[in-house]
Amino acid sequence: MGNRTLEGCHVDSRMDHLFPPSLYIFVIGVGLPTNCLALWAAYRQVRQRNELGVYLMNLSIADLLYICTLPLWVDYFLHHDNWIHGPGSCKLFGFIFYTNIYISIAFLCCISVDRYLAVAHPLRFARLRRVKTAVAVSSVVWATELGANSAPLFHDELFRDRYNHTFCFEKFPMEGWVAWMNLYRVFVGFLFPWALMLLSYRGILRAVRGSVSTERQEKVKIKRLALSLIAIVLVCFAPYHVLLLSRSAVYLRRPRDCGFEERVFSAYHSSLAFTSLNCVADPILYCLVNEGARSDVAKALHHLLRFLASDKPQEMANASLTLETPLTSKRNSMAKAMAAGWVAAPLAQGDQVQLKMLPPAQ
């Protein structure tokens, strides 16, 4: 399949060849090592039968796949929005790039709901917080998002304009089917999970306020972490979806109006690049803030430094592997909550819960 040459809008590609690639390079440098550490820490959480680790692991995998596409997008922007790697790579890397946005939002929503169940209903919904359940939910997330965003794989995604720019996965103005797909992405892929996160945060606040025995410092930690879930989605993804919705709505009303597309072109590309910061925020917030994962990462760094400083690296590597053997014994739902850094323990009367952030059981 060749490129399609179309009479498109006159967008100035010279305006955004600095900010997006600079931000992507930063995300590669910071996000790649932190997500590798986050993936390892999440794996250890899964080995300890902690369902939160399943969501963290899937989130890290999605972020790493996304980061692998960034070098080509850096090249694309440095060439002033000119894709030189062929139609096949455009489809593949564009599909991974854009689908990751909604996979990440979905898993952030899963984590938020899981934290709500752990804090507000630690015993009542214990079955929903098993590793098997988390694996099943994660499979549904991947299947749903990959399927819902697969339409571009069956269309040409390279567009050459009259100024000899070869756009990949973007056309100005957009096509009709793309506009309708964007509405689905905004309302179902972004707003719906964000609304669930808001409801989960509200439920967490109620549970924390109703626990008279929970220490004030613990309440602050719980509320901060829950609020950070919402903030990541809002800060990283909201600007992009506001412009995506605006572009789609304007096209559906005035399909041939290029004025709006030309005015928001630079802002749209900047907001799209800003979504990549999610790959930096995810491991820092959900692994390094989590007591169990933070402990695992600290141990990994400690043994890595000892390994690099040792005169007998092989012996140190063997010692590290021995020290880092994960627990394999089965844990009940309360122990899993402790491993995740959250615990909700019934008091003697059974009517209230005491919430604490604790390190994972060793």
Curated annotation (Swiss-Prot):
GO molecular function, one term: G protein-coupled receptor activity
Top-level division of the source organism's lineage: Eukaryota
Chain's role: Proton-sensing G-protein coupled receptor activated by extracellular pH, which is required to monitor pH changes and generate adaptive reactions. Activated by an optimal pH of 6.8-7.2. Ligand binding causes a conformation change that triggers signaling via guanine nucleotide-binding proteins (G proteins) and modulates the activity of downstream effectors, such as adenylate cyclase. GPR4 is mainly coupled to G(s) G proteins and mediates activation of adenylate cyclase activity. May also couple with G(q) and G(12)/G(13) G proteins.
Family to which the UniProt record says this protein belongs: Belongs to the G-protein coupled receptor 1 family.
Keywords: Cell membrane, Disulfide bond, G-protein coupled receptor, Glycoprotein, Membrane, Receptor, Transducer, Transmembrane, Transmembrane helix
Compartments where located: Cell membrane
Membrane topology classification: Multi-pass membrane protein
Spans within the Extracellular topological domain: 1-8, 81-85, 157-172, 251-260
Sugar attachment sites: N3, N164
Region (Extracellular loop 2 (ECL2)): 157-172
Cytoplasmic topological intervals: 46-49, 122-129, 211-214, 290-362
GO cellular component: plasma membrane
Main localization category: membrane
Notes concerning its domains: A multitude of proton-sensing residues, which include extracellular histidine residues (His-155, His-165 and His-269) or triad of buried acidic residues (Asp-63, Glu-145 and Asp-282), contribute to activation of the G-protein coupled receptor activity and pH sensitivity.
Regulation: Activated by a network of residues that connects an extracellular-facing cavity to Glu-145, a conserved charged residue buried in the transmembrane core of the receptor. Protonation likely drives conformational changes in extracellular loop 2 (ECL2), which stabilizes movement of transmembrane 3 (TM3) and a series of rearrangements that connect the extracellular-facing cavity to Glu-145, a residue only conserved in proton-sensing G-protein coupled receptors.
Transmembrane segments: 9-45, 50-80, 86-121, 130-156, 173-210, 215-250, 261-289
Site feature: Proton sensing: H155, H165, H269
InterPro entries assigned: GPCR_Rhodpsn, GPCR_Rhodpsn_7TM, GPR4_orph
Marked site positions, Required for activation: E145
A biological process from GO: glomerular mesangial cell development
Protein's name in the database: G-protein coupled receptor 4
Pfam families: 7tm_1 (PF00001)
Disulfide pattern: C9-C258, C90-C168
